[in-house]
Amino acid sequence: MLHQQKVVEIYTDGACSGNPGVGGWGAILRWNGHERELYGGEVQTTNNQMELMAALCALKALKESCSVDLYTDSVYVRNGISLWLKGWKKNNWQTVSKKPVKNKELWQALEGVCSFHTIRWHWIKGHTGHPDNERADALARKAIAEYRENGCFSA
């Protein structure tokens, strides 16, 4: 009997106060009537790194192979995973202009976790009132605020 993959919707966002600076990421996972919020951050990071971390940490949180619709407002993440990654690997992790790919370790980690799931990547325009994108953004900003208030990330 074939195993039916659990269907999961994920909404992700990253934020950075200064670029580089203190950054946060947020993710909402929704499946079968359930929902989970995740967030975290880094002290010295970039917005693109936080966008990657949001997707990476959300996918790592899945405990079994799933069918995933992942929504991001980051063209960098969506294009990187679906258009640029194969070329980067073929070119020994260099861009078409022969420069080292930024955030190589995060891209490698994301590619690794993606291999366990069936993922459809979706781009949604950020800061246009999409409720789940706004919630993911609020979680990313919450991580930054908690760091500023407590000197650490609590999530």
Curated annotation (Swiss-Prot):
Question: What top-tier enzyme class does this entry carry?
Answer: hydrolase
GO MF annotation, one: magnesium ion binding
Binding, Mg(2+) 1: 13, 51, 73
Keywords assigned by UniProt? Cytoplasm, Endonuclease, Hydrolase, Magnesium, Metal-binding, Nuclease
Catalysis: reaction(s): Endonucleolytic cleavage to 5'-phosphomonoester
The primary site where this protein sits is cytoplasm
Biological process terms in GO annotation: DNA replication, removal of RNA primer
Q: Tell me the residue numbers annotated for binding Mg(2+) 2.
A: 13, 137
Name this protein carries in UniProt: Ribonuclease H
Species the sequence originates in: Bartonella henselae (strain ATCC 49882 / DSM 28221 / CCUG 30454 / Houston 1)
Q: Which gene encodes it?
A: rnhA
